[in-house]
Amino acid sequence: MDPTLISLGALALAGAAATVSGCAEDLESDVGSQSNPNSQVQLGPQMGNIHRYFNKAISGEPVSYGLYVAVAGTIAWALINAGLNVVLAIIVGAGVAAIVHGAYSVSAFLGRTVGQSKKFGQPVYMDVLTSHIGPIVGHGFIAVFTMTLAAYLATTALGNPFPLPLVSLIFGITVGAIGSSTGDVHYGAEREYQKYPFGGGIPVANQGDIDIYAEYGVRNGLDSSYFCSRFGGPLTGLCFGLIIFLDGWRSILGNIIGGDLVTKTSIALLVGLLVVAVAAVINRKLEVYARNKYGPYRN
């Protein structure tokens, strides 16, 4: 079979895996309230809002997912070199990473909540711990498995020269950064502040004054994940999937058109710059259109 067709198929599969990974990563952080929105959850009890959110800011998402995917990639790499089937090796690696993820989540939830119990009256709800840890670990497993699969495809079919553990680390940091900057806005700026007018941002005076009641009953992290699965999660997946796909596509295009190594590299760089320029123009047009159509925010 033509090597170019194999590369295109591997790239399509890696892009699909990255899309699923980005979506699962964002929804996991919504269940556990990690990264940017967690500061608002942490401030909630200090503002008199006793809540039932799962509070687990282990670290920023880029750092934590860099760790999880690197653990999975390292274990998978060792097992593959030992002769184990590739899919089984990635599953085992993602399973170990899920256990690490769960251990950090439990310790972070208990530690951060207990730290606020005496002074601000925030209880440790054990049912919140038991009901949220499953979705956290489950979404995390899906994200890590698909991310490790994309990293494996990058190191084999797509010609990435670096070893699987290093590529896994880089991909984990990337997906965490995208989830933190893209999907978490839907949770932290919208879901946590639905009692305020839409579009007003989060003024300093409102920080920590989060919603503690849902459409029915008291709100928790599972409600947040359900809400964000309609927009924030898919948008994160689409963003990361496009990054993986377009980055691989420019390299493949350079290999097809170019002759020597310098020409291939130059074409790949030019195509990458063209993609960035087109994306910047589209973003600018969209922002101007939205501002002209809806106008400035008015309370």
From Swiss-Prot:
GO terms for molecular function: tetrahydromethanopterin S-methyltransferase activity. It is an enzyme of class 7 (translocase). Pfam families: MtrE (PF04206). Pathway: One-carbon metabolism; methanogenesis from CO(2); methyl-coenzyme M from 5,10-methylene-5,6,7,8-tetrahydromethanopterin: step 2/2. It is found in: Cell membrane. GO terms for cellular component: cytoplasm; plasma membrane; vesicle membrane. GO terms for biological process: methanogenesis, from carbon dioxide; methylation; one-carbon metabolic process. InterPro entries: MeTrfase_E (IPR005780). The keyword Iron-sulfur does not apply. It is a multi-pass membrane protein. Keywords: Cell membrane, Membrane, Methanogenesis, Methyltransferase, One-carbon metabolism, Transferase, Translocase, Transmembrane, Transmembrane helix. It catalyses: 5-methyl-5,6,7,8-tetrahydromethanopterin + coenzyme M + 2 Na(+)(in) = 5,6,7,8-tetrahydromethanopterin + methyl-coenzyme M + 2 Na(+)(out). The chain crosses the membrane at residues 57-79, 89-111, 132-154, 164-183, 227-246, 261-283. Its main location: membrane. Its EC number is 7.2.1.4. Part of a complex that catalyzes the formation of methyl-coenzyme M and tetrahydromethanopterin from coenzyme M and methyl-tetrahydromethanopterin. This is an energy-conserving, sodium-ion translocating step. Belongs to the MtrE family. The complex is composed of 8 subunits; MtrA, MtrB, MtrC, MtrD, MtrE, MtrF, MtrG and MtrH. This is Tetrahydromethanopterin S-methyltransferase subunit E.
